[in-house]
Each structure stands twice: as C-alpha cells, then as structure tokens.
From Swiss-Prot:
Binding site for ATP: 504-511
GO biological process, one term: DNA replication
Ranges in coiled-coil conformation: none
ATP-binding in keyword set: yes
Organism of derivation: Sputnik virophage
PANTHER family: ATP BINDING PROTEIN-RELATED (PTHR35372), SF3 HELICASE DOMAIN-CONTAINING PROTEIN (PTHR35372:SF2)
Protein name, UniProt field: Putative helicase V13
Enzyme class of the recorded protein, top EC level: hydrolase
UniProt key word ATP-binding: yes
Length: 779
C-alpha cells in the first residue's frame, strides 16, 4: 500500500442480541386517530408514525368495536451499560417509551398495566438487609410510605406526585429541590428533618454498595457519561434487581398462558387474563420470591389518557380492505348494507331506497374521502406516501367482497317486505299515514321499493279544490267512497281484504284517472292486463309462474287492471288470494327460483263490463266493492244524445300534468286517509253493487233479450214451446253461459211467465214471438 493511498479501517460493531422480544398489542384504531390529530406535536407525530409502520398484523375486537394491531418489539440493555440494568425498546418504538396519556390512549383497555409498587426503595431495602447495610430511614419509608408521603405533602404543600419525585431524587443523591409540573424545580426555604436524614443515609448506602459491587462499580467508574458515580451504582443496582423480578414475572405469566405485551421498567402490560386479577398477582409475588428471594408488591395500575389536545373520532387512515369496510360501516351505518340471496343492496340516502349498485358504495367513499387514506410507505421522518380508497379504482373494488361478507342476511327481503306499509316515500322524506305527519330525510329500516316523484307538497286548499274539480269531482257524483278506497290502498291497508270492481262505459274517464294517479304517485301505481285475474282451465303453468305479474308488482300500492274478455270468467279463488290481509304468495320470474312474497297492493278492476266469477261464494262476495264510473265524456255535438254524457275536456292532459295539480291531488288522498282514521269507511252505494253483481246482470240480460225477440203478453192464450225457448237460450251468445235452472227462474220471477202442459207439448204461457221476417243470427 503506497503512502499516498488513504485507507479507512472500520471497526465492526458487534451485532447486539436482544434480551427479549415481545409482540405488543395495541389499538390500531386509536393510533391512527392520534396520527390524525391536529394538536399532536411534531416529535410525537414522527415517533408514532414510525411506530405505526411496524404493525405487521391486525384483528378486530368486536367487544369494543376496536381494531387490535400487533407490533414486534426487541428489548436491549442500555448502550452505556451493556448487559446490565434495565432493558429498553429498540429505538424507543414501543408503549414503553410513550408518555402516559399517549400510552393509555393507544392501549385502549387491551392490556392491563401491572406495576411493582414502590419498586426501587423496596428492592434496595431488601438488598441492604441481605448485605448488612443499615438503612433505618429507607426502611421506614418503605414500611410507612403513605404516612411519609403525607408528611412531605403537608410540610411543603405539594402534590403526591411531587412528593414521590422528591423522595426518589434524594434516594439517588439528588439535591433537595421541589419539582414543578413544567420540569423545573426550586429550593424550599425550609427542609423536613426526615428527608435530610434520608438523603444522608442514601449517600452512605451508595458508598457501601460501591465497595461491595466492585465489578459493577468498575464499569461505571470508567464510563465518562456517568457523572455522579455513587448515584449511578445505586440506580443500576436497583434496576438489576428490578429486571430480575421482571423476568420472573414474565416466566410466571407465560406459564399461565397469559400474554406479556410490553415491558415497562417497573412493571409490564399483559392481556388474555381469565379469573381474579388480585389472586393472580398474589400468586405471582410468591413465585418471584421463591425464585430470587425478593419480595415485591404488585398492583393493577389504572391507565388514564387525559390528552391535552382533541382527537378526532375517525382517523384519516385505513390499513387494509377489511379496515376500510369496517370504517365505512361506522361512518355510514351497517344497516345501510344488505347482501341478500346473492345480491348486494346499498341504501341510497339521496333517494331513501336500497339500490343494487356498487356506485352507491363508491359515492359514500367519496363523501368521506379524507378518512380512507392507505399508507403505502413511511420515510424515516415519519412522512407517509398514500393512496385513497375513494379515488383509486383498484382499491375501491376490493372492499365489495368484505362488505358482502359482513352484511349477509338472506332473510332480509322477506323480513322487510311489509316494513313500508303505512308510509309513503317522497323525494325529500317520509309521510306517515298513521300520524298524518311528514318527516324530512330517510330511514333504512323502512324498506321502500318505489317513491313518489315529487317532494312533499305544501298544503294548499286552493290547489286541492282545483285538483278535485278536475279529477274526482268531474268523474263521480259522490266520489268520497272511491277516494277513501284509493287512499286506503295507497297507505297499504291490505288488512281490509278488498278488491274493487270499477265498471264504466268507454270514455268514462277510467284511463285518465289511472294516468293522474301515475303522474302523482309514480311507480306506486301499477297496471295489469285484466286477463291476469281470469280463469283459464287450459293454463298449464305452475302457480308461481301464473303469479309472476303479482311478484313484479308486489311493492306497488294500487294495481289498476285494463279491460277483460267477457268470454272468460274471473277466478274467484284469485280474488280471495289477493284480498287476504297479507297472506304470502309464491311467485317467480322467468327461469328463476320460486320466492314467497306478500303483495302490498290492492287491485282496482277498471272494466267496461264485469264477467262471471267462478267460483262465486260468500267469501268472494264479502271481498268485492263496486264503484261505477257513471258518465261518458264526449264532444260537444254528442252531449245531448245520452243522459249520462258529459262534455269532454280537450285540454285535460295539459291541466293535470302540472306540479300544482300533483300537489293538490296528493293531498286529496292523504286527507281522505286521515278522515278514514277518524271516522272509518264511508257508506258505499249498495245499488251499484246490486246493479253489477252477477245475479242482477243475469236478470238484465235475460229480460232484455227475451223482450227483444218475444213479446210478454201475460195472456194465457199466447204461448211458446219450452223446447223452442231452450233452443233459443243455447244459441244466444249472452244466454248460453246461464244455467237452465237460473234461466227458468228469471222467466218465472221477473217476467211472470207460467209453465203449461198439453197432451202434445210443454210450453211457456203469456209469451209470443215477434216477427222479424228473417231468421235471427244470435251470434
């Protein structure tokens, strides 16, 4: 090697072996909250950031809705005094190193703080006695600690903590100065005699220990960092004894399957305890004494976190997809997410309804964006590099699976399908039919599938009058029963067990009323083909398939049917099924499984004419209510042709398709239901029911048709053979569905015909045939 060459010889520092390595359990949730606190000083922020970086695993704690983080911590002896004294957490990144309030806040009840009470004075006293070193004042302080502390507090008018710190300072040969809370101290004008003698004795004890512990003193003597050598040897000896006790405590707790989380100099943090803590600590004290012949006094020390700054409820950070999901539920509410039968439903608080859309999830993430930062890395200055679950497309998709796992409830649809009955959802809130009150905002516990396409309208009597005149007032002479029926249906009063037949001629206003209802109440109003409730003996579909229409409309409130063929009868069993006060029905979509559901709707059949009902028993009759549309709306030139004609409003479309009409029309029905609650159902016009029931219609048909083709004379000389009348009945399309017995009954009771018999034939007397000149084609 030439002289000009520069060489650098680096002494290899021996790798330090930790005294012990533990896994520290902390509240990861509270740690993240601290990192998000504005009042945190920069030094502590860096310390906590680097500490957070060490978390290698997290688990949830459902008992207190916390998240437990785990950190591996290595403990070493001091660099200044290797292999002796206390052990310190590597780089100070442990609960051991944090201030009491910070430590308690991060601990959050996960660990118990077990403390060796009055550790150093107690251990030094025992050491002195074992080595024949007189220590009467130290022994007196250990035996009568509370009394001596009280004396110091009263004499100097200071707090208990100040008194303890003063005595420990004197124990380690410090000056007689009273400590202040800010770290400064002052010399009192008067001193307590006991403390003066206590200080003198401590100096003697330190001198004796230095002579006895020669090897230890030699290390300290040669260490330039140790200024007061005698004080240091006293302290280090106490720390050695303390550490020995600490290790035996560790051995005891681990033998009991109790986890030691953190070493804290004169104690430790432990968790996983079952049983009585007091009994456990007494047993541990005995174990330590048996092992090293030193007595200790253990106590559970309360951990209080009176922080001097405000900590936010939610932190700015999440550390996993699962953590993101948990925080989303905390911010938004778990009840806003339901994974039911393979479908994720998310409550949209902008509409008041559950939606099958991940975009609602993403919208919630964006709303609370500041809380979903994911730390990718942290530099040595504690600065974080982050991504955000609200803006990162890859991250936000990852939480969907965790949401599904945590909110699965395959009974949710079934349990909530009638939860909205008695309520009506508007664009800005919920109307309660039972209290006649509107509340702004939405409730995920009331599951709506539809909503009114309007904000809840203000109550305006003039608008109500105008809407009434344009709708019900124009359609009916006495609309109150019909309005009440619609109001009850809209409120979900399925317990009334009614189906409404609403017959009327063409252009009677039935279609317009349906349009008005749909315009004002949106999807709460459903429509069906009248054939859906007709009887079809050739229909081979299973029942669930037949009721597909009902399943699709299950959450509507009012179902309006269109015209129905008179060639088919109405299914009486279906009437009973759909007016059953909430009995469940089985339905399904095409190629899907059967689902049990409760129809929330009431059916209104808007027919021109009403077919026969089969079967038509008393249960069917009790469920049927009849409301007739009595008028026909025509042009002006046709107005006088019929007594039931009314002038058609050519501008009706533009008049009802307005916000003002909707405001008034909505309150017509809301008021009607309020009146129903106060006064019950109004009386219905029984004449309408009688007019449109099957028996009355049969009478009308038979009498009108017979009178058209025959003349009723009630003259016994006039007669028509029975077989001719029977043939006539069977050939006429409107008579052949009526039974022979019923037909004959009407001839006798209504037309007053009498059956006669001669030697050659049987006949109806009082009747003669009209002559049209040609054969009649009954079809």
């Amino acid at each position: 090697m030439s002289k000009t060459q520069k060489t650098t010889v680096k002494a290899k520092k021996a790798k330090r072996i930790p005294v012990i390595e533990l896994v520290e359990a902390i509240s990861s949730k509270n740690l993240k909250r601290l990192l998000s606190a504005e009042g945190l000083d920069e030094v502590t922020r860096i310390q906590l950031s680097l500490y957070y970086r060490k978390i290698f695993k997290t688990t949830s704690n459902p008992l207190n809705n916390d998240e437990v983080g785990f950190i591996k911590v290595k403990y070493f002896h001091s660099d200044k005094l290797e292999d002796t004294g206390r052990v310190y957490a590597e780089k100070g990144r442990s609960l051991q190193s944090f201030k009491k309030a910070i430590r308690a806040f991060i601990n959050n009840g996960i660990n118990l703080d077990i403390d060796m009470k009055n550790s150093h004075p107690t251990l030094i006293t025992q050491y002195c006695k074992k080595n024949k070193i007189l220590c009467p004042f130290l022994d007196d302080y250990v035996r009568r600690r509370e009394k001596r502390l009280e004396d110091v507090m009263v004499f100097h008018k200071i707090s208990r903590d100040q008194a303890k710190e003063l005595i420990l300072r004197l124990c380690y040969l410090g000056s007689y100065k009273i400590p202040n809370d800010d770290g400064t101290s002052y010399k009192p004008k008067k001193t307590l005699e006991f403390l003066e003698k206590f200080k003198e004795e401590a100096e003697i004890i330190a001198d004796r220990i230095a002579k006895k512990e020669k090897e230890l003193y030699a290390k300290i003597k040669d260490n330039d960092d140790c200024k007061n050598k005698k004080a240091v040897i006293l302290s280090v000896l106490a720390q050695q004894l303390e550490h020995s006790c600490l290790m035996e405590m560790y051995n005891f707790f681990t033998s009991k399957k109790i986890r030691v989380s953190t070493l804290c100099f004169d104690g430790m943090l432990i968790n996983g305890i079952n049983g009585n803590i007091s009994d456990l600590l007494r047993e541990c004290e005995n174990f330590v004494y048996e092992q090293i012949n030193y007595k200790i006094n253990l106590e559970e020390k309360p951990m209080e976190h009176k922080l001097k700054f405000e900590v936010p409820i939610f932190s700015d950070y999440v550390d996993s997809d699962s953590d993101c999901q948990i925080k989303l539920f905390e911010l938004v509410g778990k009840n806003k997410f339901k994974f039911c039968n393979g479908v994720l439903w998310v409550f949209d608080d902008q509409t008041g309804m559950f939606e099958n859309s991940n975009h609602v999830v993403f919208r919630y993430l964006k709303r609370y964006k500041e809380y979903f930062n994911f730390i990718i890395s942290t530099d040595d200055d504690g600065n974080h590099k982050t991504k955000n679950y609200a803006t990162d497309e890859v991250l936000r998709k990852k939480i969907i699976g965790f949401i599904k796992d945590e909110c699965q409830d395959n009974e949710w649809m079934l349990k909530t399908q009638t939860s909205s009955l008695g309520y009506l959802l508007f664009k800005d809130g919920i109307y309660n039919f039972n209290t006649s009150t509107f509340t702004e905002g939405f409730d995920p516990n009331i599951v709506f599938k539809f909503r009114v396409p309007w904000k809840f309208p203000k109550y305006d009597k003039e608008l109500i009058k105008k809407a009434y005149k344009l709708s019900f007032g124009a359609l009916f002479d006495n609309p109150k029963p019909f309005i009440t029926s619609l109001a009850c249906a809209l409120a979900g009063e399925i317990k009334l067990k009614k189906i409404y037949f609403c017959p009327g001629k063409s252009n009677a206003g039935k279609s317009y009323l349906i349009k008005m209802l749909q315009y004002c109440f949106g999807d709460y109003i459903g429509t069906i083909n009248g054939e859906n409730i007709s009887y079809n003996s050739k229909d081979s579909r299973d029942e669930a398939a037949k009721y597909r229409w009902a399943y699709l409309l299950a959450n509507t409130r009012i179902v309006m049917s269109s015209e129905i063929s008179m060639k088919k009868s109405i299914d009486g069993n279906m009437i009973k099924k759909f007016a059953s006060a909430g009995d469940k029905i089985v339905g399904r979509k095409h190629c899907e499984s059967e689902i049990s559901f409760t129809p929330n709707f009431t059916i209104f059949c808007m027919f021109n004419d009403i077919p026969e009902i089969e079967p038509h028993d008393e249960a069917v009759s009790n469920r049927l209510v009849y409301h007739e549309f009595p008028y026909v709306f025509v042009k002006e030139e046709e107005l006088n042709e019929k007594p039931y004609n009314k002038l058609k409003d050519e501008d009706l479309d533009s008049k009802y398709q307005t916000k003002d009409f909707a405001s008034g029309f909505i309150h017509i029905l809301l008021d009607a239901y309020k009146n129903y609650l106060e006064n019950g159902l109004p009386e219905f016009d029984n004449e309408v029911k009688e007019k449109w029931t099957a028996q009355t219609k049969q009478i009308d048909k038979v009498t009108s048709i017979i009178n058209e083709y025959y003349e009723v004379t009630n003259n016994v000389k006039d007669f028509v053979p029975l077989n001719e009348i029977l043939k006539f009945k069977e050939q006429h399309k409107d008579l052949k569905t009526i039974s022979k017995n019923r037909f004959n009954e009407i001839l006798v009771e209504e037309l007053k015909l009498k059956e006669g018999r001669s030697a050659k034939l049987r006949y109806w007397s009082g009747l003669k045939k009209r002559h049209f000149g040609d054969d009649i084609n009954f079809e």
